[in-house]
Amino acid sequence: MTTYLNNPDAVRALVQPDRVHRDLYINQEIFQLEQTHFFVNTWNYAGHESQIPDAGDWISNDIGGRPLLVVRQADGSIKAMMNRCAQKGSRLVSAPSGNTDKHFRCPYYAWTFKTDGSLLAIPLRNAYENTRLNECESGRGLTGLTHLRTYRGFIFFKINDAWYSPNFVDTFHRAV
């Protein structure tokens, strides 16, 4: 059995001028390589603005093995963040879409976040005294995505800064 992790020559050999090896479709290592290197570094489709017309409307997807939450804000803007609690990483929502009046609440420890991902409330907050909560990532709220663009109603995002194209429209205007 061929090992593809850390073996770029073996991966390149999967594509021939007249055929593609079946491992590209069924091999777990190839799948992991795609998740790790491709989906997190390129623009991905998250949904359409028509799916979240009202404030508090949200859609969730898993892209590149990461849970994503896209939310319409009260001012009409759209924010995207990771769909996982900042404390323990559990999913905040499990349905593919819905509406929240004002916040998202973790189903396990009830940490509560505003629709923009900022931390709203922590039960028994005094239990976190002397833990430097405000200095750590959890204390800042949900992990937001800085690379979010809409084009003709289509919502796209990118997780990493690698391969970042500052001119998003030039990248996609012919395809969309």
Language model feature labels by segment:
Residues M1-S77, T112-V176:
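Rieske [2Fe-2S] iron-sulfur-binding subdomain
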Residues D57-P107:
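Glycine-rich active-site/cofactor-binding loop and its immediate structural neighborhood
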